[in-house]
Design a protein with these regions (language model features):
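N-terminal lobe/hinge region of extracytoplasmic solute-binding protein
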Residues: 1-25, 143-144
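Gly/Pro-rich hinge or "lid" segments in bacterial periplasmic/extracellular proteins
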Residues: 104-177, 187
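Surface-exposed binding/hinge segments that line
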Residues: 33, 52, 66-126
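Short helix-initiation/N-cap motifs at beta->coil->alpha
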Residues: 179-191
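Hydrophobic residues in beta-strands and at strand termini
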Residues: 23, 33-34, 94, 104, ...
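Aromatic- and charge-enriched surface segment that lines or borders ligand/interaction sites
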Residues: 19-67, 101, 189, 194
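Residue-level recognition of beta-strand termini and adjacent short loop/turns
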Residues: 25, 94-96, 155
Length: 194
């Protein structure tokens, strides 16, 4: 998955799903222009609405997301997460398919860095609603907008990621696949590392 920004090798934020951004003079409002070539692994375009939906879902108290607090910088986010305001009052709106406006509670100099954190990643609303409570529980119940897609997930054993052929920056992705193993015994982990 990929957010509006990612961190480069020097840990500096660089545009990812966003093509560019502007910040208001008071530092409390950001406008992001999204890449028109950013796609989900199912071929759907990644839109500003995907970010709004994901952030509203993150903050919905019924979701009980452990990392919801990381979005409290966004206007009304904390009140929404506490059930004091509806998710529709979140300070994030899709101006059009490729323009996202975000209002903050106060200036946050490291806000672009935060956007690289997974809690700020988008979700394909249509796909999430289609999968319902099964969303994200298996490799085939998730769509991806980043450099890799999960092609196999054997619970308690491991998972496999394959290069996402729909990824906007696929030319720079050098690996074709990544295999992860779940290893519970510390001694086994050490032996595998050597």
């Amino acid at each position: 998955m990929e957010g509006l920004y990612r961190l480069d090798k020097d840990n500096k934020p660089i545009p990812a799903a966003a093509e560019s951004s502007t910040k208001s003079e008071d530092g409390k409002k950001y406008t992001f222009k999204l890449r028109k070539d950013a796609k989900w692994s199912n071929g759907d375009p990644v839109t500003a609405k995907d970010f709004v939906f994901a952030w509203q879902r993150l903050l919905d108290k019924n979701t009980a997301a452990e990392y919801a607090f990381i979005a409290y910088y966004i206007k009304n986010a904390e009140a929404i997460n506490k059930g004091e305001k509806p998710v529709t009052e979140l300070g994030a709106k899709a101006v059009d398919d490729y323009t996202l406006e975000v209002e903050l509670e106060k200036p946050v100099p490291y806000f672009l860095n935060l956007l690289a954190f997974p809690s700020y990643y988008p979700l394909n609303e249509k796909f999430v609603k289609e999968k319902g409570d099964k969303y994200g529980l298996e490799a085939d119940t998730t769509v991806y907008n980043g450099p890799f897609v999960m092609s196999s997930w054997k619970h308690e054993q491991g998972w496999q990621l394959k290069k996402n052929d729909k990824y906007w920056d696929k030319k720079t992705v050098k690996l074709e696949e990544i295999n992860y193993s779940v290893v519970k015994e510390v001694a086994t982990k050490v032996n595998l590392y050597d």
